[in-house]
A protein has these predicted regions:
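Active-site-proximal alpha-helix that buttresses catalytic centers in soluble enzyme cores
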Residues: 16-97, 185
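Phosphate-handling substructures
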Residues: 26-30, 34-48, 90-149
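Glycine-rich phosphate-binding loop signature in dinucleotide/nucleotide-binding domains
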Residues: 65-68, 157-161
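His/acidic metal-ligating clusters that form di-metal
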Residues: 149-152, 157-158, 165-170
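Acidic, low-complexity terminal tails and accessory targeting/binding regions
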Residues: 10-17, 60-63, 96-118, 159, ...
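Short, active-site-adjacent cap segments at secondary-structure transitions
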Residues: 26, 80-81, 104, 171-173
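Cofactor-binding loop segments of dinucleotide-utilizing enzymes, especially the Rossmann-like FAD-
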Residues: 22, 100, 168
């Protein structure tokens, strides 16, 4: 996997972030339950990786640019944690779990827990370029809120020069220009905090 560099315009100390999107998740065990709706919303975050997702995570763990990193920080969501585990085993780096590096929140009010509602919220999010429209039936997390959540949390790691962050595509897209980010894709960027 190649590590390309993206520069960001944020003020303060320079930090190199090696973003890794989590491996392919396996929601099938949740979907096959007698009451799958019991695992809607954040419940879906309990799903592990598929076999293919594990294989890809083990492969990406050998990425050369990881040798520059000082620590690994992972979203607390299972698919990211499992991916980060393989990177930690391969690199020997300490793994920190960060609950605020989670995926985009399609529901800030706790009202749209079914898949259809999440898809509608996502449609509005895309239609309004990450802003919350007045006509949206759901209050979802905006791009600005995601960026703020991430940067506020990143503050406590500001003494590190290079870190690996295993997280989610929509969060990564707040800081890198890639429209599509594949499972286990590695994107290196530099920011100032």
């Amino acid at each position: 996997m190649a590590c390309g560099l993206v520069a960001l315009e944020v003020q303060g100390n320079k930090m190199k972030i090696i973003f890794v999107r989590h491996g392919e998740p396996d929601y099938s065990m949740l979907d096959k339950l007698e009451n799958p709706q019991l695992y809607s919303g954040f419940g879906r975050d309990l799903a592990p990786l598929t076999g293919k997702g594990r294989s890809l995570a083990k492969e990406v763990a050998k990425t050369v640019c990881f040798g520059k990193a000082e620590i690994i920080i992972s979203s607390s969501v299972t698919r990211a944690l499992e991916t980060a585990h393989y990177i930690a085993v391969e690199t020997g780096l300490d793994l920190f779990v960060e609950p605020f590096f989670h995926e985009w929140r399609p529901d800030l009010d706790g009202t749209n827990s079914d898949l259809t509602s999440v898809l509608v919220a996502h449609e509005y999010y895309l239609k309004h370029q990450g802003a919350l429209s007045e006509d949206s039936p759901y209050r979802y997390e905006t791009d600005l809120e995601m960026r703020h959540r991430f940067l506020r949390t990143l503050e406590k790691y500001k003494n590190y020069k290079t870190i690996i962050i295993v997280t989610h595509g929509m969060l990564m897209r707040q800081f890198v220009p890639d429209e599509k980010i594949d499972f286990c894709q590695v994107i290196e960027c530099e920011i100032e905090i």
